[in-house]
């Protein structure tokens, strides 16, 4: 029937990004939603149907995408053994073969290209290299969304740590005065994705839609925490010294150096893209001060 709702298949439906997409699509009511997950029995979200799909097993993708009008695709760099270009390439190929009309890919800036090879941030660049695969696939519509530096991480794994005097603080190799962090509540990315599917004429020609709730420095973050009654400090250390602090510190230092030099989203103005993202989402993302006021619960040992 012509009145039947179009079907959107959502990869990573149990995760931060995919879960938010399912919620936003469900609240909008324009589409049927198929959650794609490696654990259908454990899925507890708002999707209309749940189907097994594993990006490590391309043979599972044809059935998972059958009948879908749209696909939201996201990969997880931090999952051990993940090859994002291979996974996303297989999913794009399967989506095209299934007749998908609109594919939305969750990407990040190409740090390698932006910095001329100065900085290596594979969790960004690997996703960016999938963009050309999406563009060349020949979908009727394709869109790119750009997740921010998650607010959640700044009170979790990348939040202030316990200092020798018992207070909380950051000790990092970045100038705390430099405003370079494009941040946001990752739960709100779904509003942009749902809006992009609902307004393909505005977004489906390869638009890049970043979620940006705030643009901040670490000093800005400290000021907000202190204003909420928390004793939080920031200490800048040389990158060379920081590299020996813990396994993976060198890679985090590289990422922070990129931020300080080029910002999270890269150089230049991003105002037009942010404005379009907010327009199709139908709302302005939550600023960090408001998010922190409503949700901030600092602990001595942040949890992931």
Kindly give the residue locations of the regions a language model identified.
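Short secondary-structure boundary micro-motifs
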Residues: 47, 165-166, 268, 274
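A hydrophobic C-terminal alpha-helical subdomain
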Residues: 204, 239-304
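Short, charged low-complexity linear motifs
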Residues: 91, 130, 136, 272-279
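Intrinsically disordered, low-complexity segments enriched in small/polar residues
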Residues: 40, 88, 97, 264-266, ...
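Oxidoreductase cofactor-interface core, primarily capturing Rossmann-like NAD(P)-dependent enzymes
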Residues: 2-46, 53-66, 73-86, 93-102, ...
């Amino acid at each position: 029937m012509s009145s039947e709702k179009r079907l959107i298949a959502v990869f990573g439906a149990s995760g931060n990004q995919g879960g938010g997409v399912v919620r936003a699509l469900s609240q909008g009511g324009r589409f049927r939603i198929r959650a794609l997950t490696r654990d259908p029995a454990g899925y507890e979200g708002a999707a209309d149907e749940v189907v097994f799909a594993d990006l490590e097993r391309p043979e599972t993708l044809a059935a998972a995408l059958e009948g879908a009008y749209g696909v939201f695709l996201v990969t997880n760099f931090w999952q051990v053994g993940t090859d994002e270009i291979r996974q996303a390439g297989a999913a794009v190929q399967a989506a095209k073969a299934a007749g998908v009309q609109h594919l939305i890919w969750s990407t990040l800036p190409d740090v390698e290209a932006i910095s001329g090879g100065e900085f290596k941030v594979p969790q960004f660049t690997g996703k960016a290299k999938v963009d050309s695969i999406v563009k060349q696939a020949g979908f009727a519509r394709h869109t790119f969304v750009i997740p921010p530096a998650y607010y959640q991480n700044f009170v979790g794994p990348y939040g202030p740590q316990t200092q020798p005097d018992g207070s909380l603080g950051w000790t990092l190799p970045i100038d705390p005065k430099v405003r370079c962090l494009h941040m946001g509540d990752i739960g709100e990315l779904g509003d942009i994705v749902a809006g992009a599917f609902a307004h393909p004429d505005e977004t489906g020609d390869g638009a890049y839609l970043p979620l940006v709730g705030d643009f901040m420095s670490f000093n800005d973050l400290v000021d907000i925490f202190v204003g909420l009654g928390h004793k939080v400090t920031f200490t800048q250390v040389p990158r060379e010294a920081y590299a020996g602090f813990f396994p993976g510190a060198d890679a985090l230092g590289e990422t922070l150096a990129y931020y300080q030099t080029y910002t999270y989203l890269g150089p230049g103005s991003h105002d037009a893209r942010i404005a379009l993202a907010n327009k199709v989402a139908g709302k302005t993302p939550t600023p960090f001060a408001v998010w922190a006021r409503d949700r901030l619960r600092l602990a001595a040992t942040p949890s992931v």
